[in-house]
Amino acid sequence: MHELFNKVLAKRDLSRAGDLFSVPDADIVDDITEVLSEISPIISHADYVKNNNDQSVVEICVTRVLSCIRETKTAERYCAALVDLLRTCLLWNLQPSGTTKEEPPHAKIAADIISSIFLNYDKKELMKIALPVAVQFLPKGNRELSRNLASYLSLAAIDHAGLLSPHTESVMESILSGNYGLLRVLSQVYEVAPEAVTPHAPLLMPLLPQCDPQERMAVFQLYLLIVQKSPEVLESCVPQLCGSLLDSDTSSITMQILLKLSQHSPSLLVDHFEQLRLAAKTNPGTIPLCAQIMTTAGIGSKETAQQALDFVLEHLPTQALLQQEATRLCSAYPVLFTDKVLACVRQKNAALSSQQDVGNGLANKTSGGVTIVSLNSSSPSPPLKPVPVGAPAINTTIVQPASVVSATPTPPPSSASAPIASSTPVSAATPTPQHAGYTRRVKLGDSRSTGRLHPASNTHRSVTRLNVASGSVGGLHKSMTRLSNSQINQQPGGSSNGNVVVQSGATPKTPTGLSNPPVTPVPPLSNNVVITGHNRHGIPVTSGGVTVTTSPSKVRPHSQGPSTLLNSSTVLMKYSTDALNQSVGSISIPQSAAVATLPSTQTQNAVSVHHASPALPQSASNGHAKSVMKLPVNGNSEVIVSGPTTNVAPRRSDNTSRTLLNANSVMDQRMSTFEPYQIMRDPVQQFCEKNFNSIKSYMDEVSQHLPPPTRCSIEVSNEFAERRTKKVAKLHFACQIRGPHCLYSKTCFTMRTRNPKTWIHMMFLDFQVRHFVKEKCVLSTRESGISNLKNIWQILKCENRSFTELVTSQFPQVKDREILVNELRHSGFLDVFEVSKTDKSNPNCNELEYQWGCFLCNHPDKAVGFLNGSNQPMIEGQLKEKKGKWRLFRRWRTRYFTLSGAHLSCKGSSGGESIDVNQIRSVKVSRGARNIPKAFEIFTADQTLILKPKDGKNAEEWVQCLSIVVAHSQARDNPTAKTNSLPARSIGSSKPSF
């Protein structure tokens, strides 16, 4: 045995025990068995429980031994010796005693050894030796030790559940006595030894009210395993299981257990139908499971079958899967098949048919995102042509007139009747009966919604149906304004005469091919329209712009009146009074139309929509003046809509929908065709404008306690590199005064934060206030500062909420701000920065009531002493010192320290030494109650020094002086480095990623 171990254990020399940590591991690794054998008789002595000196010596020796085992990875080699020491601890009382409930010395030793052993829970041979003894500590009455053992045994059960199966009785006794953490072990043990766990399963049900959600889930997972093999074991638990149905966390798995029980013995669940109904109502996601249980349990008699059928029919229209349960019940009891059942089935089928109608005809949603909206037509339309593989995928909305809507999918037209190859209008097809899902007819001038959306299987498909009264000339359905588009796409079909295809959305990177779905009927429209796009050099754009030219298929007589002018609501956000001077236009689609995309971010070209009308008779042309509408698109391009104007709106024979824009009352009339500008604005910007006074008052108050970060970035932490990387937010603070002696004139104080949500919210509010004070307007999410915060929030994924929800939520409360203040305090920010009242007389003053500046900017009179680098003392006095390795076990030494602008020097009985300030990398502060510094740790390249005032005073002054000197030294030596003088408590080694 090593000489130092021999002296410490033989003489119980506590003064030398701390020196054991100076001995290299290699010198004592072979003596561990002998050391443990020497410790065993010491702790077996009757006087050990009362001898504090012996307890301290043994605890230090055990800690050193366990440290050596861990570092040298020799746990398997010395496991037997450690287990022998555990057996010795088992012979003594391990329960906390006295009013302070202090842990007995043997319990402390056992806890240290057990935690060290179970670090190797994946090693089977070690677990074979340790588990039998470790389990014996469960009934010893030490709750803390038992709770820790539950966690250790859960880890061991992952790979070695078979080793725990012989100890199931001890585990169950500990669970029943209140150690519910062991419930997580039972499922693993059951999989390898079901006979050991099954008899105890019913005993767990009364414990559920005292368990937390994870422990309850562990019990139900065990029950789900048991009910598949031995359902009879849980028959007595049915009432308690039904009582747990209202728990949303475990409702689904409880239903699965009850379903297996109903299959085993249907009569068990008959008396609990009402509880099942209530559970399904509370948790709608369990309706299918509930229906299966009631069907399986109720099929035994006609009365119970009727109850089950009533439940199934109640939810059948919204749960198509329940038709199978209705079929089972009606097959068992045909008398139950009544008109009510038939009506429900028909309603469900009608809903499905309507969804198919929407999916196949009315809302042809391709992989490019095409939505077809039907307006009043009776003629069939051709199927969509597939887009070539190389074509970009787009989001498209197709607006088609339709007179009636059928609940039955319309078959695609044959080539003989399809209007693709014909230049004449298509003959009207016989309309199918309209489904009851649409009831309201539009009135003249009605700007409200005139129809309801039929149910669809995908919520992203938008379908609007219009049934315009014969002869009406106005009232375009307002839901058309939801087609927020700034681009135009064409549908093939030279004589389709009126398909209006409006494109929206960004172009995905991957090409997408379209399927060949049928398209709903469309009516003929009139005058052809030329839609062209040019870049700034006048060259037609074929990629990134619109290049569409239409040819006339048939000239519409003027007696038929004007056609529909439909344009994008986003294009028409800003319009003038001249824009709507009785303009009437139409868009018709040629057969050879090409699909193109107009990017919304770079629109330098002008898109024009104008009539290429044939020559009109003189009498007709005299009554029509030409109007021009110029509308801005994204601020730097124009949309020009020109064409003949008219005040005549005669009755049309084909009863198709159209819109008349009358400019005589354009300022007084509500335009149902276009969304108001306010609706299209950024909701965050609207929120800030509406609540700016509250935001300004709040930030003026908060600025007194919290500094605003100037920037936020992201680091990728490697703390958990073996499992995954972790993204950490990093804050950058600047001095807001920037005086001549500023510590951070060229650098930023940076710190990592564990509360990015609150900081991002505070930064957002601060950005808004500062921008408003300067520019008299608030920022939108498109501005660079706000968009950067939004990107950081999306990358961090702190919570399952959007950036808009975060910044429009309630302002951070006092307790949230206190957490941020503590972060600043622990990072050392408050040691080098101070808050002061903003000087409003300064033209470059801070926008808020208070400003945060570094110490030297707030106290320029003290700058000379800190910055001259001389040896003149700034602070001096006696400090207690510890340094070197294993400082925890070393004694404090009192020495006299002097801090100047260049050195930290000390004097003592052993002589004097000095540390150059430039060598100090950082200072870490240890704080006590009320955040008062107790000690501080100085880190250099080759040593670590712990200091604290001898009398406990002046610690805060020492920390501040050290922080300022170090900050100035680092800024002087590395003026471009963006680093803080006092790094926050490390979250892990990290590398910048954003």
Curated annotation (Swiss-Prot):
Q: What is this protein called?
A: Protein melted
Show the ranges annotated as biased composition (Polar residues): 486-517
What protein family is recorded? Belongs to the MELT/VEPH family.
In the record, biological process GO terms are: cell fate specification; cellular response to starvation; lipid metabolic process; positive regulation of insulin receptor signaling pathway; positive regulation of TORC1 signaling; R8 cell fate specification; regulation of signal transduction
Biased composition regions of type Low complexity, renumbered to the chain: 415-433, 540-553
Entry coiled-coil feature ranges: none
Signal peptide bounds: none
Please give the record's comment on domains.
Answer: The PH domain is required for membrane targeting.
| The keyword Lipid metabolism appears for this protein | yes
Membrane topology recorded in Swiss-Prot or TrEMBL: Peripheral membrane protein
Checking Pfam families in the record gives: PH
Function field: Participates in fat metabolism regulation by recruiting FOXO and the TSC1-TSC2 complex to the cell membrane, which positively regulates TOR activity and negatively regulates the expression of FOXO target genes. Involved in R8 photoreceptor subtype specification. During early embryonic development, may be required for ectodermal patterning.
Gene Ontology MF, one: molecular sequestering activity
Q: Which domain of life is it from?
A: Eukaryota
* Alphabetized UniProt keyword annotations: Cell membrane, Developmental protein, Lipid metabolism, Membrane
- Entry's Gene3D superfamilies? Pleckstrin-homology domain (PH domain)/Phosphotyrosine-binding domain (PTB) (2.30.29.30)
GO CC term (a single one): plasma membrane
What is the protein's quaternary organization? Interacts with TSC1 and FOXO.
Spell out the subcellular localization from the entry: Cell membrane
Disordered as annotated region, ranges: 404-461, 486-521, 536-565, 973-994
- Domain PH, residue spans: 872-967
